[in-house]
Amino acid sequence: MAGRSIEDMSIAFIGAGNLATNLAKALYRKGFRIVQVYSRTKESAQELAQTVEAACTTELQAVTKEAQLYIVSLKDAAFVELLPQIVSGKENALWVHTAGSIPMNIWQGHVVRYGVLYPMQTFSKQREVDFGQIPCFVESNSEEDVQLLKDIASALSEKVYEASSEQRKSLHLAAVFTCNFTNHMYVLAAELLKKYGLPFEAMLPLIDETARKVHELEP
């Protein structure tokens, strides 16, 4: 990338789900060049591609071989199953996945340059988040690409860290406790309140204050 800015990199997205949508939009807003979006769902591929001014495809064999960076954001099982097809003919580009629970070495033996870019946040397509405050954790099989991924992540977020696969696995587990388990408690609370004809909205000030406290006090 000597003599060129990182925004000049051509980026292809494999996946157009919640995380991919938010990450692609964030990169696009910062001036990065998204050249293609792949999703097996035509509507998802088209919607994201139009937003970031990219081409789209629903066929793995039609994924461009010209991108410099491929960002894979698929469900874990689909990623593992499709990995050989995804990288075929594009083994010399830089490949990263965005999963918290999948180790970096899943790429080993498939591609030359690889890593992880893990934004630790809960995402939905309908709700855009402030990437500037999202912790992003990076890892790569080369120091040069670690720095490249840090530079890319730093264009989006003020909070960029290098983390090993083992550390990231623990981060992901902690995130599940913090987010998924909490949301399940909300569901149970909502069901209980509904049973007795009470509104869940009554819980919102309590939820908000509990969340605010953790910013100032130890859990």
Residue ranges of model-derived segments:
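Phosphate- and divalent-cation-binding pockets in alpha/beta enzyme and binding domains
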Residues: N22, E47, E81-L82, I106, ...
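NAD(P)+-binding Rossmann beta1-loop-alpha1 motif at the extreme N-terminus of oxidoreductases
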Residues: A2-T57
